[in-house]
Amino acid sequence: METATSSPLPIKSRRNSENSGSTTVIPHMNPSLATPLTVSTMVNQSNSKEFMKLTPVRIRDFGSPLKNVSTNYHFLDSENGKGNTMDNMYRENFILISKDLEKLLENLNVIYQNIGYSNTEIITKEKIIFTTISNSIKQFFEQADEELKRLSAENGIEQDILNNILERINDPSGIKTIPDLYIRNAILLQESKTVPQSPKKPLSLLSKKAALDTAKKFVLGSFLPRLRDYLKSLITLKHLIQSVKENLPGLTEADNEAIAEFPELSTLTAYLLQIENGKGDIGLSMKFIIDNRKDILKGSAFKTINEESVKHMNEVIKIYEEEYERRFKSVLTKKVSISSICEQLGTPLATLIGEDFEQDLRSYGEEENSTSEIPNFHPVDRERMSKIDITLEKLQAIHKERADKKRLLMEQCQKLWTRLKISQEYIKTFMRNNSSLSTESLGRISKEVMRLEAMKKKLIKKLISDSWDKIQELWRTLQYSEESRSKFIIVFEELRNSATTLQEDELLLETCENELKRLEEKLTLYKPILKLISDFESLQEDQEFLERSSKDSSRLLSRNSHKILLTEEKMRKRITRHFPRVINDLRIKLEEADGLFDQPFLFKGKPLSEAIDIQQQEIEAKYPRCRVRMQRSKKGKCGANKENKVIKNTFKATESSIRVPIGLNLNDANITYKTPSKKTIQGLTKNDLSQENSLARHMQGTTKLSSPNRRATRLLAPTVISRNSKGNIERPTLNRNRSSDLSSSPRINHTHGEHAVKPRQLFPIPLNKVDTKGSHIPQLTKEKALELLKRSTGTTGKENVRSPERKSSLEDYAQKLSSPYKEPEHSIYKLSMSPEGKFQLNIQQKDIESGFDDTSMMEDENDKDFITWKNEQVSKLNGFSFTDI
């Protein structure tokens, strides 16, 4: 059956339909309005004053049922001239439906009668028809009503949850969380809205649901990460609380109350697991929050979930972590101690504390391969810590008892091993095999003590005899006198004569061992002296052999004479080098040992100190340059400085000061430089010159060796030693008695000839380099050269000694020497020009004070530089070309 519900028809059409007796199909009918419920709803809404205002279309548009109804209404109104007939429109539609239904029932009645149904049956079937129609309409109504209630309830719950979440994250207005203003105002409660009248138009349930779905993405996207971090902190804190099992002093009362209201650890772990499983699924996450909204949104544990709450939670966790770490480290330390003691005792830990507790104790410190972000915590409560302490104390007591027992047994073993002279290999093997504190090791050590005691009973007499022999040997080594030995001998004889039992023999043996120990301590101090005495005796033997060999003249005629001489030279060097050191060290050691030993040391029946003095005198007599004198002199100087506290002032000669003997008259001394390090003084007698030969000579780069008898010297005033000074200052006269104190520093000759050239050349220039025509440089003749060679090889054997004889000839020869064209390398003479254009001669002087005494007056003869220079000068003189033959 089709019914027209679109709009009222014209009266003419309606009449035609009634007369025709058939159902008329209205071309403007809309299928969405083809139900009685819809029509009823439209009729009920016709009385609403807001109906026309809420219609979102204009009156003359024909796109929707409401548009058609409004258009037809105005059409009928203008045609009939009636007032507002909205109710009449819906009533006419229902009249048409009822008429169609009536006609349908009439036709159905005709069919029933033709079939032959009775009136009762026909009435029953009509009731069924009306009941079915009524139930169908009622079913649609109930479905719509249920949908309405469901949407209203879901929207209300989700809206309430979202608003509670915004309060938990400290954003009740949603400004920080929801960026869309329309969505934010659609889901917020009226008291949380920033714009109370928004939205102006009420939303349908489906529109509100769509707005809530959009808002859930923003709210849950901000809330779930915070909730996940907060749950992790809560779970960590719960683990720590369960491990420590007590409130710590660093927490406030509010913290303790909040901790007491936390859900159980299993509940928090389940919450975190559901959040991880629903990650990325808004539906599952929303369902999780709805199911657990009593704890998450209503409970005090989740009252505020933001960065500040997480930060505060981490501070509480830090307090518990510090306490846990302290206790955990203590447990680990005690665990290591327990394991070490059990290993030393050789006893399994399970037999002492039980298997369960042993497994729990072993679990501490063992890393577990877990993928969870939350660390694993071990129980460190007071009860567990006390149990571990009791276990450790028990093991320490057992360890101490066994260690003391082993120490006593090992002391007995050590004494017996020493007395019985057991080999070290056996002792090391035994101690290595019994290093633990197990009952088996203690039993083996006890058996070893018993075995050694049995051996001692059999060998104690021999041990006493060996100890007595060793004591006598040490007495001889330490040179003990009979008086020093007599005290112990008396005690020893008394104990030995009265010893009849094993205990008395042990007392005698112990007395001998104590004496041995005392003598060995003295021997330790005496060993360095023994070593020096041995060296002293060896050097004496070498000296005696050297004397005997030197007296045998036939050794020079033997075939291996060179080997004999080489051996003698090695012995001589060994004596001169090592004998002084041995003598000095031995004397020092003897002085140190005077307070430790009662009697003096003897050497070949004489006191060792006397033998040392005699030997030192012999060495000084035979080897004057030996180190004995030098070391003793040095030692004497050091002692004088320490005792008298006198500091000797030494004057060092520099380039601007020259050391000159006191009383020297420079006017009477004509000094001419012949070599860089040698000088002769003109105007001195031959005897005086012989004394001058003993003066110490200086070379550049060599040390200064002074005479043993030093005399006082002073520095000459600068006005006197100035090169250009020509004043009338009286120069000191030369004192012959003090000529030996002349310094070897070069002097500048202040008396110059008319045509003298300075500085004077030490060797003549060859004739082929000199222009003989008009040259003022004289030539060296054969006669003068021979005189020079004769003087250089005089009786003194010194090259630099000059005789006053034939003084004029020497002056003529000196005038014939020319200026050098180039100074040799390493020369002490440096020629420079002053700003006034005058030549200046600078003499470089290096005086080095020697800390050793001079032991030879011919030291310079062995100087390498001096010999080289001497050979050069002689070769140059031999290379002269003589013109006068």
Swiss-Prot record:
Example of a GO MF term: microtubule binding
Signal sequence residues: none
Biased composition (Basic and acidic residues): 799-812
GO biological process, one term: initial mitotic spindle pole body separation
Cellular location(s): Cytoplasm, Cytoskeleton, Spindle
Record key words, sorted: Cytoplasm, Cytoskeleton, Microtubule, Phosphoprotein
InterPro entries: MAP65_Ase1_PRC1 (IPR007145)
Listed Low complexity bias regions: 734-745
Annotated segments matching region Disordered: 1-30, 724-759, 789-812
GO annotations of cellular component type: cytoplasm; microtubule; mitotic spindle; mitotic spindle midzone; nuclear microtubule; spindle
Pfam family, one: MAP65_ASE1
Domain of life: Eukaryota
Keyword Phosphoprotein recorded: yes
PTM-bearing positions, type Phosphoserine: 17
Function: Required for anaphase spindle elongation.
Subunit description: Interacts with CDC48; the interaction is likely to result in CDC5 degradation.
Family: Belongs to the MAP65/ASE1 family.
Other facts: Present with 556 molecules/cell in log phase SD medium.
Alphabetized PANTHER family for the sequence: FASCETTO-RELATED, PROTEIN REGULATOR OF CYTOKINESIS 1 PRC1-RELATED
Protein name per its UniProtKB record: Anaphase spindle elongation protein
Organism in which the protein naturally occurs: Saccharomyces cerevisiae (strain ATCC 204508 / S288c) (Baker's yeast)
Protein encoded by which gene: ASE1
